[in-house]
Amino acid sequence: MLQMPSKQPISAGIVVVAAGRGERAGSSTEGPKQYRMIGGKPVIVHTLENFMTWEAAKQIVVVIHPDDEALFAKASRHIISETPIETVHGGATRQESVLAGLRYLKDKHVSHVLIHDAVRPFFDHVLLDRIAERLGNGAPAVLPAMPVTDTLKRADSAGTISATVSREHLYAAQTPQSFVFETILDAHEKAAASGRSDFTDDASIAEWSGIPVTVVEGTPDNVKLTLRSDIAMADDKLSAPMLPDVRTGNGYDVHQLEPGDGVTLCGVFIPHDQRLKGHSDADVALHALTDALLATCGAGDIGDHFPPSDPQWKGAASKIFIEHAARIVRERGGTIMNADVSLIAEAPKVGPHREAMRARLSEYLGIDIERCSVKATTNEKIGFVGRREGIAAIATATVVYRWRKR
């Protein structure tokens, strides 16, 4: 699994808590609120789809009410997931339900666990990656939260305001609340053994057990659907017209030439009396296009993800880099619409290999070949390119991201 170099990879188990009855949301023929339809799909399906497509997720366990097996089966019947999804029955309280999910994961060999409310469908991979980075850097517990912005009042039993509470250092907790797996399992087991059943979230159990909890920035949209009006607003949000967010990213790269037997450009090997010098396979075209894709979502550059100082990338095929960038784009809601590469070289001739290069780009990016362009020009014997000392590439990627009217 590829990770940013600043963090250790995690193997995450996901506990989705879906055993509640949701009485405040009112009764419905669709069942509890996690099975209500928003944007044409049940709430719980939106939640699961976000986790299913997250690279670090290794096992998902959904904790459901014993009476909801048919509801869950109906809701999930169209789900196709490479990440295993299983269900277990929950208990009388959220705390008991979470413990049931944790016990299921005990023999699944996960390093960490993310515990999430099924009725919080509006989180994204940016938040998950933020949490994973803290966990990978050694935090035993990570809580996404938003600073409290409303003015807080304290009232007496008669409903009269008695004080204004300072908002300083106050946060509204969200999920997924995330932990080193064995640590939070042990804390939950100890809480159950001691008869404590009044914890309202998992971070509270961690605090009680003496586990330090690190706060990371949550997302404003990551709200819990509690009332009937929440579900109606969520449906409106997902059903609103989709507006395109078209972004263009540019990338540039250059590699020196040295004596050799050929160069690799756009994943195609071209016999030549020189080769490109570099830490990886030095595919200057794919390196430029990787940067262009990352630029469309502010995800840094190729050196951030694959530093040349890291020996694991020595001689690596640049296919790894471009497919990684394309995956990041898709995880962040992007659709790659076009990829254009311009090669600047005196030799070798690109024309005879252009269609093979376009086919490789189509394969790596998962888009139609008509959306892939490869062009070449000389530098009119000017500069380092003109002296056949190197090859340069300029790439442009067009990606459509989507956002919704509120």
Swiss-Prot record:
Coiled coil: none
Pfam families with a match to the protein in the record: IspD (PF01128), YgbB (PF02542)
Signal peptide range in chain numbering: none
GO terms of molecular function: 2-C-methyl-D-erythritol 2,4-cyclodiphosphate synthase activity; 2-C-methyl-D-erythritol 4-phosphate cytidylyltransferase activity; metal ion binding
Residues binding a divalent metal cation, per UniProt: 253, 255, 287
Residue ranges of the region described as 2-C-methyl-D-erythritol 4-phosphate cytidylyltransferase: 1-246
Pathway the protein acts in: Isoprenoid biosynthesis; isopentenyl diphosphate biosynthesis via DXP pathway; isopentenyl diphosphate from 1-deoxy-D-xylulose 5-phosphate: step 2/6; Isoprenoid biosynthesis; isopentenyl diphosphate biosynthesis via DXP pathway; isopentenyl diphosphate from 1-deoxy-D-xylulose 5-phosphate: step 4/6
Site positions for Positions MEP for the nucleophilic attack: 167, 224
NCBIfam families from the UniProt entry: ispD, ispF, PRK09382.1
Family from the record: In the N-terminal section; belongs to the IspD/TarI cytidylyltransferase family. IspD subfamily.
Classification via HAMAP family: IspD, IspDF, IspF
Name of the protein: Bifunctional enzyme IspD/IspF
Organism (species): Rhizobium etli (strain ATCC 51251 / DSM 11541 / JCM 21823 / NBRC 15573 / CFN 42)
